[in-house]
Amino acid sequence: GGTPSAIDSSLIVSMVEALKNKFSFSKDVEITIECNPGTLTDEKASDYIRCGINRISFGLQSTDNKVLKMLGRIHTYEDFIQSLDIARRAGFTNISADIMSALPGQSVNDYTNTLNTVAELGLQHVSAYSLIVEEDTHLYEHLKDYPPLPDEDDERNMYHVTEDILAGAGFHRYEISNYAKPGYESRHNKSYWELTDYIGL
């Protein structure tokens, strides 16, 4: 979680190798790293693959650069595409992207465009989250400074559009906000729902 791709990859490699020295890893272990588009380099991606990281997840959020700027994201959609290419060149074949709906000023058409674009990228997994404005957060305190949030009808339509477009692209929903191609369901996500044991480090 967080943005581990922001730090030197040697630290990630040393951490994974330390864990391998302390624990027995299954031969088909799934190790995921979260990346902020724009922070991934060829060197980092190669280091991740070399130490056994075999799944990468990008916090894309939207394909609309205006939306990304409004959200205060440091990346553009073009940065994401570049990071996606880097990941694939390094050898990643299990790639996920996070997108968001019900954002300030976001129309159903805006969100549909993002979904259609993401569905055509050849990803194995998509996490589609609906914005929830929590009290005592920066967004809650400054909501008046943003465009209006979508109404309930639009938010409901965004939910249905997510189902329709991703299903049409071969994804199935296996958890509340997560969609995967067959065989690419996140083991980390599934472990929560199946109440399996895990260690938080």
Question: What are these regions, as identified by a protein language model?
Answer:
Residues 1-201:
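C-terminal scaffold of the Radical SAM
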